[in-house]
Amino acid sequence: MSFIKQVGKLIRPNDYSSSIFQTSFLNNVIQVRTATKRAAGSKTNKNDSAGRRLGPKAYEGHFVKPGQIIMRQRGTKIHPGENVDIGKDHTIFAIEPGYVRFYYDPFHPLRKYVGIALRKDLNLPTPHFSPRVRRFGYEKITDPAEAEKEENHMSRKEFLQQPELEKTRQEQQNQEEQRASAFRNALSSQFNLDLSEADFQLALNRLLNISQLTNVGQTLEDAEVQSTYNYVFDLKLSCKRGEMTSEEFSNLKMHYIQFAENFDKKVTIDAQGNPCTYVTPEAKKENQNEILSKLENEFSNRVISEKDKETIFDLIMTPGIYNLSQQSYLKDRFLPSVLPTTVKETVVEDVDPKKPPKGVIVTRIFDEETKQIKVIGRTKEAYIGQTDLDKSLA
């Protein structure tokens, strides 16, 4: 055996290890081509090539367009500032039209920045707590025909959706008209307000606004404050547009604030967004305690009949007493989908899972005493489900 073969065996003891070595070696040397200069080779026969023309391409105060190169460099000798971006080779270019500004940032005193000021009179950097100047790119159209054409312009997708959007808009308008009509009838028939026509319209609009705000999650108190703020703000805008004088604005503002304060103590909105009589906080607390006591004494730990369901539901939904979260809590407690096992009339012990009695539903529960899964039967009375009134509200 030659010396080369002996050395070969020492380096490659068996075919299995050789295959592992070759495979791992090939996995490590797989070349990934990238769009860089050294992808094809690494010969050094062009070390004397021409320079890359590095340096600034636009100077202080020069006007540049989007995409125009401001600085070519190797490394970040100059850092990108406002309204510019930096490329893979550290080239800084403009992303907005404006004027070049070279500056230092107080938060990075050793870095030099270049940015774009959108106006000639602006300097960089922008003060830290000041709003940044943004360019929206709009130009005023003076030709009426061109302006109307631009307003009516829409994309193809938007154009194809117009029938469906118009149908949805019409449905919403019909719902708002029906709601306004219901509120108008309620104010006229249920409450003795003795309001003028103008004040009646103010009251109607206020109730509609408060109802919309409570439906989107605001509390009744926040909705009342927001409704007052919106009305006063609209008056302020009308005054700024010259539609009324400052004296008229002050008079209307004071009148509405006094009107809202008096009206909110007579009529308010319940948890379902419908008009109801105002209840003072003291009376509301007293009614809540009375209703809760009645529910606990008469409807706890017993079978609930259909008549009991309606009674419990009416007590919980008493207008102006509970908010939505309180009503949800009380319904989960006194009108659960399944009665608790503490209601002994609905529990059947020692039931055969394979042959349960008629009208008994087999279920498994965790026994707290034995710490084991227990098989019991529940009668149909244990499953309350939703009331018809609750389904109508859902």
UniProtKB/Swiss-Prot annotation:
One of its GO terms (molecular function) is structural constituent of ribosome. Residues 1-34 form a transit peptide. GO terms for cellular component: mitochondrial large ribosomal subunit. Belongs to the bacterial ribosomal protein bL27 family. The lineage of its organism: Eukaryota, Fungi, Dikarya, Ascomycota, Saccharomycotina. It is found in: Mitochondrion. Residues 36-57, 145-181 are annotated as: Disordered. Signal peptide: none annotated. GO terms for biological process: mitochondrial cytochrome c oxidase assembly; translation. It comes from the Eukaryota. NCBIfam families: L27 (TIGR00062). Pfam families: Ribosomal_L27 (PF01016), Ribosomal_L27_C (PF18471). Gene3D superfamilies: 2.40.50.100. InterPro entries: Ribosomal_bL27, Ribosomal_bL27_CS, Ribosomal_bL27m_C. Component of the large subunit of mitochondrial ribosome. Its main location: mitochondrion. Keywords: Mitochondrion, Ribonucleoprotein, Ribosomal protein, Transit peptide. This is Large ribosomal subunit protein bL27m. Residues 145-170 have a biased composition (Basic and acidic residues).
